[in-house]
Amino acid sequence: AVKGEGVVCDSRDDERTQRAVAEFAAQLAKTSGGENPVTVADELPASGIRFVLDQTLPEEGYRLDVTPKGVEVRASRFPGFFYAVQSLRQMLPAAVYGTEPAPGEEWVLPCVSIEDAPRFAYRGMHLDVARHFFSVEEVKRYLDVMAIHKLNRFHWHLTDDQGWRIEIKRYPRLTQVGAWRSKSQIGSYEEKPATFEFGRYGGFYTQDEIREVVAYAAERYITVIPEIEMPGHSLAALTAYPWLG
């Protein structure tokens, strides 16, 4: 458990910040075996882990001070607090990312002072789900890893020749037909002769699942950039609606 006054949020912190702090405290409690209740206060104590609103810091920046008395996190908005939480996690044992208690670990933070802000506004990762389909849970795990590394743009490659992955209700054949293939090429296109794995393969995301992923990303300060390719790389769409070719 956190010594002193536990985990305390500034009453001026927004809801997303308070949720991020509560999630961190709950995860820490689950893996360390302690109890870390989160409180919200107008006046913050001198000990424990304190999340203080500081409008002098840039939007995505934060200041993190760990002393023998406790931890103080300062930021002006949710992104800064969120990134500070990622840094706190990274200073703890790796078990903090687990799902089971690890009481044998040494749950101690080193004394440190960090003032951090990103150099680049766009910090992105790309995921191609057309050639190889990833489930919603796998996409969420990908977003979790992005958040750990403080990345903020998720380029979601949803369509290509090999598959159409997003539900469009006006054009149902895009997912009824275009989301599935009867064989998958193994290895490089340059390999001759080509090698194939035969069998029905594919999948797609419903509109509700897309919304779920977008909301999950937003909680991690990640903007989703969906990519739908046209007119090139559109064989999946043309297979579903050949008269469009």
Question: Model-flagged regions — what are they?
Answer:
Residues 81, 139, 206, 210:
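Aromatic/hydrophobic pocket-lining residues that form the small-molecule binding cavity
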Residues 118, 162-219, 234-245:
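Aromatic- and acidic-residue-enriched carbohydrate-binding clefts of CAZyme catalytic domains
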Residues 128-161:
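A conserved hydrophobic secondary-structure block that centers on an alpha-helix together
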Residues 142, 213, 224:
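Aromatic/hydrophobic pocket-lining residues that form π-stacking "cages" and hydrophobic walls in ligand
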